[in-house]
C-alpha cells in the first residue's frame, strides 16, 4: 500500500456520511431528515411578513364505477396577477395513486416529488407497495412538516386519489382523501371533492353531476364541467383556453390500467365539447 493512498480510496464506503451506513426504517423521508434536513419541504426559515408566491388553484376528484380521477385547471396566481397559465398540478405518485396540489406552488411541487420518491423507496426496500391508507398517512406526515410555513401563509393543500387493490368490490375501490394544513386527513366518502380557490363552485357543480355508476368518459366530462363552472365564478381558476391550446389536466386511476394521464389530445376534445355546449347553454 502506498503511503499516499488514503483509506477512503481503498474503502470507498468510508467516504460516505454515517447516515448512509446506519440501518434505519424504509422511509426515505426519515433518511433525508437525518442526512440532509435542509432539503425537507418546510425546513427552511420562514421570512417575516407576507410573501408573494405563485399559488395553484382548483383541483377536483370524483369516483366512478371501477376507479377514481383527478382533474385540475392550469392557472397559477400571485396576488391579483396570473403567474402561469399552463402549470401542471396533477402528479402520478405510483401505480395506483395520484396527487393534485393547491396552495403555494413551489413548496407543493417539492412535497409531491419527495412523496413519489418516498413511495418508490418503500417499495424497493420492502418488496411490496404501501396500502392505500399507508400512502395517505405518509402524505399527512409530510404535510405536518410544513406547519410553520402554513402558519406564515405558505400553505399547501394536496388532494389524494387512489385505487384500493385490496378492496372487496373493485367497482367501488376508488378512494379520495383530503387534508387540512395541519396534516389532518379525511376520507371523502361522498364520492367527490375539490380543493383550491374555486372549490366551492366546483363542488356545487359536482353535486348535480356526480354519478357513482358513471363510466370513465362520463366522469371525466363531469370533472371538466365542474372546472368550467369554477372558472366562471373564480378569477383564480383558469378555464379551457382554446386559443392558447391550454386544457385541464386529468388523471384516471383504475384497477386494470392503474394511474394514467389522459392524453392532451383527448383533454382538448372534451374541453372543446364543454365550451361549445356552454355556448348553447351557459349554465350547463
From Swiss-Prot:
GO terms for molecular function: threonine-type endopeptidase activity. It is found in: Cytoplasm. It is an enzyme of class 3 (hydrolase). Its EC number is 3.4.25.1. HAMAP family: Proteasome_B_B (MF_02113_B). It comes from Saccharopolyspora erythraea (strain ATCC 11635 / DSM 40517 / JCM 4748 / NBRC 13426 / NCIMB 8594 / NRRL 2338). The 20S proteasome core is composed of 14 alpha and 14 beta subunits that assemble into four stacked heptameric rings, resulting in a barrel-shaped structure. The two inner rings, each composed of seven catalytic beta subunits, are sandwiched by two outer rings, each composed of seven alpha subunits. The catalytic chamber with the active sites is on the inside of the barrel. Has a gated structure, the ends of the cylinder being occluded by the N-termini of the alpha-subunits. Is capped by the proteasome-associated ATPase, ARC. This is Proteasome subunit beta. Its main location: cytoplasm. PANTHER family: ATP-DEPENDENT PROTEASE SUBUNIT HSLV (PTHR32194:SF0), METALLOPROTEASE TLDD (PTHR32194). Pathway: Protein degradation; proteasomal Pup-dependent pathway. Residues 1-56 form a propeptide. Component of the proteasome core, a large protease complex with broad specificity involved in protein degradation. Keywords: Autocatalytic cleavage, Cytoplasm, Hydrolase, Protease, Proteasome, Threonine protease, Zymogen.
Amino acid at each position: 500500500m502506498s503511503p499516499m493512498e488514503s483509506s477512503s480510496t481503498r474503502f470507498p464506503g468510508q467516504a460516505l456520511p454515517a447516515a448512509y451506513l446506519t440501518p434505519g426504517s424504509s422511509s426515505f423521508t426519515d433518511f433525508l431528515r437525518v442526512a440532509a434536513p435542509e432539503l425537507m419541504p418546510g425546513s427552511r426559515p420562514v421570512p417575516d411578513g407576507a410573501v408573494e408566491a405563485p399559488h395553484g388553484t382548483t383541483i377536483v376528484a370524483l369516483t366512478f364505477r371501477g376507479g377514481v380521477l383527478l382533474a385540475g385547471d392550469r392557472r397559477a396566481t400571485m396576488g391579483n396577477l396570473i403567474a402561469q397559465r399552463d402549470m401542471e398540478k396533477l402528479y402520478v405518485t405510483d401505480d395506483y395513486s395520484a396527487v393534485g396540489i393547491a396552495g403555494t406552488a413551489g413548496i407543493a411541487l417539492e412535497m409531491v416529488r419527495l412523496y413519489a420518491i418516498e413511495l418508490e423507496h418503500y417499495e424497493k426496500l420492502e418488496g411490496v407497495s404501501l396500502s392505500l391508507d399507508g400512502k395517505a398517512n405518509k402524505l399527512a406526515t409530510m404535510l405536518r412538516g410544513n406547519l410553520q410555513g402554513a402558519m406564515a401563509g405558505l400553505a399547501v393543500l394536496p388532494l389524494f386519489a387512489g385505487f384500493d387493490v385490496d378492496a372487496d368490490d373493485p367497482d367501488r375501490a376508488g378512494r379520495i382523501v383530503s387534508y387540512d394544513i395541519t396534516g389532518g386527513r379525511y376520507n371523502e366518502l361522498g364520492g367527490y371533492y375539490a380543493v383550491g380557490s374555486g372549490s366551492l363552485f366546483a363542488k356545487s357543480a359536482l353535486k348535480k353531476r356526480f354519478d357513482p355508476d358513471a363510466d370513465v368518459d362520463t366522469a371525466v366530462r363531469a370533472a371538466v364541467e365542474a372546472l368550467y363552472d369554477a372558472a366562471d365564478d373564480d378569477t383564480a381558476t383558469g378555464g379551457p383556453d382554446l386559443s392558447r391550446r391550454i386544457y385541464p389536466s386529468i388523471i384516471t386511476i383504475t384497477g386494470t390500467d392503474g394511474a394514467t394521464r389522459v392524453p392532451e389530445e383527448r383533454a382538448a376534445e372534451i374541453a372543446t365539447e364543454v365550451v361549445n355546449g356552454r355556448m348553447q347553454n351557459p349554465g350547463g
